[in-house]
Swiss-Prot record:
Name the record gives this protein: Ribonuclease VapC14
Keyword check for Nuclease: yes
Residue sites binding Mg(2+) per the record: D6
Enzyme class (EC, first level): hydrolase
Coiled coil regions, renumbered to chain: none
InterPro entries, A to Z: PIN-like_dom_sf, Type_II_TA_system_RNase
EC number, as in UniProt: 3.1.-.-
Function text: Toxic component of a type II toxin-antitoxin (TA) system. An RNase. The cognate antitoxin is VapB14.
Length: 103
């Protein structure tokens, strides 16, 4: 089965222990079955940029989470999107096939 995760679900997975039911569900579904749409990535990116203006320290944490977790899990590890995302991957210095995990 395939699941498309909404922005609030992806955000709920950011902090371990904050939303145990969401984390338990995500752990029960293989990462390969979890997807996000482009608008979800854009909404998260918009939130990170907004936080950069008001709280640079927190924005660093959010940026690292977005770049190291969200993009790696949902974009760079998916072979079908690699050709589209390759320029972004190179820009932020990713190895497209390194290991992934939520936390």
């Amino acid at each position: 089965m395939t699941y498309v995760l909404d922005t609030n679900v992806v955000s709920a997975l950011r902090v371990p222990g904050r939303h145990p039911a969401v984390a338990a569900w995500a752990d029960s579904v293989q990462v390969a079955e979890q997807f996000v749409v482009a608008i979800t990535l854009a909404e998260i990116e918009r939130g990170v940029i907004a936080k950069e203006r008001t709280d640079p320290t927190q924005s660093e944490h959010l940026r690292r989470w977005f770049d190291d977790k969200v993009l790696r899990i949902f974009v760079f590890a998916r072979r079908g999107t690699n050709l589209i995302m390759q320029p972004l991957a190179g820009h932020i210095g990713y190895s497209l096939y390194s290991g992934i995990s939520w936390f």
